[in-house]
Amino acid sequence: MADKYIVEEAEALAKRALHSPIAQATPIYEQLLSLYPTSARFWKQYVEAQMAVNNDDATKQIFSRCLLTCLQVPLWQCYIRFIRKVYDKKGAEGQEETTKAFEFMLNYIGTDIASGPIWTEYIAFLKSLPALNLNEDLHRKTALRKVYHRAILTPTHHVEQLWKDYENFENTVNRQLAKGLVNEYQPKFNSARAVYRERKKYIEEIDWNMLAVPPTGTSKEETQWVAWKKFLSFEKGNPQRIDTASSTKRIIYAYEQCLMCLYHYPDVWYDYAEWHVKSGSTDAAIKVFQRALKAIPDSEMLKYAFAEMEESRGAIQSAKKLYENILGASTNSLAHIQYLRFLRRAEGVEAARKYFLDARKSPSCTYHVYIAFATMAFCIDKEPKVAHNIFEEGLKLYMSEPVYILKYADFLTRLNDDRNIRALFERALSTLPVEDSAEVWKRFIQFEQTYGDLASILKVEQRMKEALSGKGEEGSSPPESSLQDVVSRYSYMDLWPCTSNDLDHLARQELLVKNLNKKAGKTNLPHVPAAIGSVASSSKVVYPDTSQMVVQDPTKKSEFASSANPVAASASNTFPSTVTATATHGSASTFDEIPKTTPPALVAFLANLPIVDGPTPNVDVVLSICLQSDFPTGQTVKQSFAAKGNPPSQNDPSGPTRGVSQRLPRDRRATKRKDSDRQEEDDTATVQSQPLPTDVFRLRQMRKARGIATSSQTPTGSTSYGSAFSGELSGSTG
């Protein structure tokens, strides 16, 4: 719908019509005004084109179509020019028609802040009327005084100039009476001038040339919407403290002007109609709703609001027609439900029941209709048996809908029918897909916590864990019981058996365990190339165990961070791209939870890693290996090196393995290689018969034992100098 409302194309068409002959311009204007019927600028351009060729009949027809819906001063000035052109040469009859036209115009737009020139023109026209005798002169002066009084009470741009003209007028007529009249109207003028200054602030924020298009959420549209809301609120406050009739007139004028720009905004139409209802003018509200549905025919909101107003004032047949109109335009479950409720209110139970029997046969009927009618029968008609039968009938069709199961369970709970509730849960959980059964399991547990004993509660919880643990991957074992289960079991509404800090701690632990178990066993270390391919093609990314992180102070730049480390550099280079890919292709919810447990110091450290040119490993594979590795603690490392000598420096890029080998004598290293050769066959058999170790150092020894001869002849391998996430050194060759 919004595709046809292209402002740039409309402006281009208007410009083309402006320079085209009237025969070619007319269809262009008609096309424009069919899309933008409240554009006073396009109407003015159209009518001026007809006036230029003296096509008076077409001009009158155009004015009859636009004047009352486009309350803008330039368009109405064009109207008064046309009237004066037609009637100026018709003598007294023409003067009378012109006077009526001025009064008609000021009755509609006389409260506009830009209407000052119209007041001035009207006063000048009255002064120009001939006075053949004293009575006519007196009548003319009385008419002028009345117009002046109306003009100086209107907060317009020309209010001060009109006040000066009024003072001169009174002094010219009668100096003795002038002082009394001027003093009487001075406070009223001061009030109008003060209101004008405030009014001007709101008017200046409004773009009067804005074309009415359906809302698209642009900043300009929102700004204009806010500006109009402020202006309407200002006018509703009656800042000038004028009488109710005059204030109502100004508010109506403000709403009509607002609709020229916000013609496709249903909230503006609704506010306008509601204001009429609160003001006691229901007939005016009906007209507003009728215009609104003509402007936005697809708005169900406005149709429901209109039907509600008609029903509230007792116009049942009018409301029924509106509901039937909704059903005819878009037959959906919501329309069925709302019509059911209306029939129940307006015509009784039997009418609603009869319609339900027809509605359930409709292709657009869903489980919502069954729930709504069953609830209506139970709550309003006090017929639990009827409601139970409706739920049972719907269960045959919607057993696979978790929401329907839960609503049925709620109904049985209100009946205190615990036997049928258990039967319902068992029936539903035996047929529901695992991925759709989580909420039903939770409700089953809540039910057991209320109606069952401890054994039944624990049994259902265990069944839920076993059922839901297998929905992700085959062979996964059900999660073990945790303190989180106890908290869930013994909490009630917003009451918890622990503090908020305990809850946060348990939540973090649950997240870490979830991340650890999620990918445990998926990466097959002897087949690293296959693992690389699977990680690259999958949107599920393995994340590190953040609980074992070593806090890094970013203010202290160590040699490890500053060294030309290809692995660390690759982590620095690929980490943002990995993050972006994860957030784009999936697992966004899991990834969003990781930064919550990442220390700020580590984030700063990763951001400051230098960029190094060279080959970069796949970060996902490196992290998956590190995640499954059982790194020795600091105390274990110290004890290990205490037996062999001083531990190597953490700043040594060669790692602990290289540091030890450099301090061993040559013959010791040779002996070590011979021992490895002699045990190669035994080690190979042992490795093949045992599961792969999770220790990266043991894995390195296994690979070294397998390929020591090849690696000694052809130096191919890789060395990992540490994990950018843990801060510990590791080495591997193979």
Swiss-Prot record:
One of its GO terms (molecular function) is mRNA binding. Residues 709-734 have a biased composition (Polar residues). InterPro entries: HAT, Rna14-like, Suf, TPR-like_helical_dom_sf, TPR_rpt. GO terms for cellular component: nucleus. The keyword Repeat applies. Residues 664-677 have a biased composition (Basic and acidic residues). Residues 637-734 are annotated as: Disordered. This is Cleavage stimulation factor subunit 77. The gene is CSTF77.
